Regions:
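Bacterial N-terminal signal peptides
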Residues: 8-16
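Sec-dependent signal peptide cleavage junction
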Residues: 15-27
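Positively charged n-region of N-terminal signal peptides that target proteins for export
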Residues: 1-4
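Signal peptide-directed extracytoplasmic domains
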Residues: 71-124
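Amphipathic alpha-helical membrane/lipid-surface binding segments
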Residues: 259-314, 318
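Sec/Tat-exported extracytoplasmic proteins
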Residues: 53, 119-123, 149-157, 176, ...
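Soluble oligomerization/assembly scaffold segments of membrane-associated complexes
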Residues: 120-233
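Long, low-complexity, polar and repeat-rich extracellular regions
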Residues: 24-64, 75-78
Length: 326
């Protein structure tokens, strides 16, 4: 009888542990939404920001200062004031990360797709994030505020994942700036590629216990950039920057600790980008086809030119030979 009781207790405990683990994993399911306000907001500017973000009385409020930006995004530069703000609402497990910039004209450096990819890299899960500012700003203050809010709520993100997230965002911003107005390029195409790569890396990790190799990362990066029409648009240096960032992601705590959830977040991000990008993604692919066709033409032309040169050389040789004889 005692054995039966003990066995039942053990079985109950074993059944309970996964639920406890899931509850621990989902402790980010906050009861109240969070409002992260730029520390320099006051009066009418604060009210306008709250209106833009739809902040209600039941929101928990945290302030983000220039010191916070220096702490969480150390390479952001010397910001003198913080106006960019954000809200975070948590969703049920498996619903991904959504980011919307409610004042797109005032966020000058970071796009919603970059925020989304950066959030996933940092290890944020199942969140609806809104960004806004009453003044034109880079938007880095809001991102630092998001990291701070997670720490304040007891859900501190892995510091290396945050560093990876910051580097990724800065590098993607740099790549976008360097390719701005280039035919066939779009920020949406780049960020769709990044989300696609992340999903495929997580899918690999789900199938293997060992660490993802650098060669696996490089193969996926090259394949995705080629499929999405960016291989011929980006420089070798830019491709290497992407490969380096994705290597960081492959080894990150965010991916390796829960590849299934990471893959789901990346997949949802990719779907969102594809849904909201219109024909921008197709334009990149079409441009790649045009470039490929032109390259093929040039290749064929070079072969034909070489053949003509050989024929001309033979003719010149024979002509010179006959001139010497006669």
């Amino acid at each position: 009888m005692k054995k039966l009781i003990v066995s039942t207790a053990v079985a109950t405990l074993l059944l309970t542990v996964p639920g406890m683990a899931k509850a621990e994993e989902n402790k980010e399911d906050w009861d109240k939404p969070v409002f992260i306000k730029g520390a320099d907001l006051e009066g009418q500017d604060l009210q306008q920001t709250e209106d833009d973000l739809g902040v209600k009385d039941d929101y928990e409020t945290y302030s983000v200062t220039t010191d916070d930006v220096s702490k969480y995004i150390p390479n952001s530069g010397n910001l003198r004031y913080i106006y960019s703000s954000a809200t975070i609402k948590h969703k049920k497990w498996g619903n991904g990360v959504d980011v919307e910039i409610d004042t797109p004209d005032n966020i000058t450096k970071v796009t919603s797709e970059q925020y989304q990819n950066a959030s996933i890299t940092a290890g944020i899960k199942d969140a609806e994030i809104h960004i806004a500012s009453v003044e034109k700003v880079t938007g880095e203050g809001a991102l630092a505020g998001i990291y701070k809010a997670y720490e304040e709520k007891g859900n501190e993100l892995n510091s290396e994942d945050i560093q990876n997230s910051n580097k990724e965002m800065q590098d993607l911003t740099s790549i976008s700036k360097e390719n701005q107005n280039k035919d066939g390029y779009s920020d949406e195409a780049l960020n769709a590629s990044i989300a696609d790569i992340k999903q495929q890396l997580a899918d690999i990790k789900k199938k293997q216990d060992e660490q993802i190799t650098p060669q696996q990362v490089e193969d996926i990066v090259n394949k995705v950039l080629d499929e999405r029409g960016l291989s011929g648009t980006l420089t070798d240096n830019q491709k290497q920057m992407i490969t380096d960032n994705m290597t960081n992601v492959a080894n990150s705590n965010a991916l390796t600790s829960d590849p299934k959830a990471f893959a789901k977040n990346a997949k949802d991000a990719l779907k969102g980008i594809e849904k909201n990008s219109g024909d921008l993604l197709d334009k990149a692919k079409d441009k790649a086809k045009d470039l490929n066709t032109e390259e093929n033409r040039n290749f064929v032309q070079k072969i034909w030119d070489s053949i003509l040169q050989i024929i001309q050389s033979i003719i010149d040789f024979i002509t010179n030979l006959f001139n010497r004889i006669f």
